[in-house]
């Protein structure tokens, strides 16, 4: 996957991803209109399909709501790369079908850098800077869940194959 980096700092909580006042919505498309509204008001209008959210440590901390990864999915972000994730956000993102990769080198990535990410190997190529970083690749079974679009779609596939 290839996309432009949207850079965020440490401790980006789920209220920053999608403010609580928008929890009345539950579809990815509707939530996408308000993604990062309080911290990056330009995000929803300027994010392009396959763009990549890049952050520091503890991305997705705070409330354990599925609305945050749903908003990212609705924004058509191809993946989220962070130094670390709040565990409940990490799991919710997988369940929703949003790829998440942990990479210690996110400080080297700047807002607007063009990235190419190989989810299967965890290799991140920064095309803007000519650098390569190594993220922790997702285990095969987790990648299968993400590839199917989330846990529900993955379960449907397993049932249909029986």
Swiss-Prot record:
Its EC number is 4.2.1.33. The keyword Endoplasmic reticulum does not apply. CDD domains: IPMI_Swivel. Pathway: Amino-acid biosynthesis; L-leucine biosynthesis; L-leucine from 3-methyl-2-oxobutanoate: step 2/4. InterPro entries: Aconitase/3IPM_dehydase_swvl, AconitaseA/IPMdHydase_ssu_swvl, IPMI_Swivel, LeuD, LeuD_type2/HacB/DmdB. Belongs to the LeuD family. LeuD type 2 subfamily. Catalyzes the isomerization between 2-isopropylmalate and 3-isopropylmalate, via the formation of 2-isopropylmaleate. NCBIfam families: LEUD_arch. This is 3-isopropylmalate dehydratase small subunit.
């Amino acid at each position: 996957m290839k996309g432009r980096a949207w850079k965020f700092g440490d401790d980006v909580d789920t209220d920053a991803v999608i403010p609580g006042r928008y929890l009345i919505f539950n579809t990815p498309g509707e939530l996408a209109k308000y993604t990062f509204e309080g911290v990056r008001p330009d995000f929803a209008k300027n994010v392009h399909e396959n763009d990549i959210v890049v952050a520091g440590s503890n991305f997705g901390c705070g409330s354990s709501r599925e609305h945050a990864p749903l908003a990212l999915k609705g924004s058509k972000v191809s993946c989220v790369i962070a130094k670390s994730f709040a565990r409940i956000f990490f799991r919710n993102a997988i369940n929703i079908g949003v790829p998440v990769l942990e990479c210690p080198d996110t400080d080297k990535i700047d807002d607007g850098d063009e990235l190419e990410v190989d989810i299967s190997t965890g290799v991140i190529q920064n095309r803007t800077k000519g650098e390569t970083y190594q993220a922790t690749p997702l285990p095969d079974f987790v990648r299968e869940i993400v590839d199917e679009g989330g846990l529900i779609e993955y379960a449907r596939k397993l049932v249909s194959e029986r």
